């Protein structure tokens, strides 16, 4: 029988299980709501390492990156979410805001319009420049 010890970051990942990943995800939601996006990202890193296909975790991490003004990582995460869920209006809207903050107006406009087309919420319509009739 081999008896070796896992140390460092690998030990943290090895210690995790599906239940702790759910707890970490929920805790990350609370950290983001409490304006601690960097703390949320740290928790979500282990969740995504174990479940890279989890779109909800990636979307939450993208929001945390955005809140921490880490625009490039936010953009990459939102794009990955949209590869998997091209009809996710919120992801289009959030990606548009990310492009807007990074000075990429043409890309922002495109995604604002996609968000509004997918879900005609007043906030999405206004951001897309569509007349809301108000």
Place the predicted regions along the sequence by residue:
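Structural signature of tandem alpha-helical TPR/SEL1-like repeats
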Residues: 34-42, 68-80, 102-114
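Structural marker of alpha-solenoid helical repeat scaffolds
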Residues: 16, 50, 84, 101, ...
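Start-of-helix register in tetratricopeptide repeats
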Residues: 22, 56, 73, 90, ...
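Long, contiguous interaction/recruitment modules in multidomain scaffold/adaptor proteins
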Residues: 1-23
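Alpha-helical segment of the N-proximal tetratricopeptide repeat
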Residues: 18-53, 67
């Amino acid at each position: 029988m081999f008896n070796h010890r896992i140390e460092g970051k690998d030990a943290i990942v090895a210690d995790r299980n599906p239940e702790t990943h759910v707890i970490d995800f929920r805790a990350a939601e609370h950290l983001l709501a409490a304006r601690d996006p960097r703390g949320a990202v740290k928790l979500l890193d282990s969740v995504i390492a174990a479940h890279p296909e989890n779109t909800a975790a990636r979307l939450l991490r993208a929001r945390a990156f955005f809140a921490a003004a880490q625009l490039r990582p936010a953009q990459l995460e939102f794009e990955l979410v949209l590869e998997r869920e091209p009809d996710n209006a919120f992801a289009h809207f959030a990606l548009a805001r990310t492009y807007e903050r990074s000075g990429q107006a043409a890309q922002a406009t495109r995604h604002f319009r996609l968000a509004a087309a997918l879900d005609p919420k007043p906030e999405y319509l206004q951001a897309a420049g569509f007349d809301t009739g108000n």
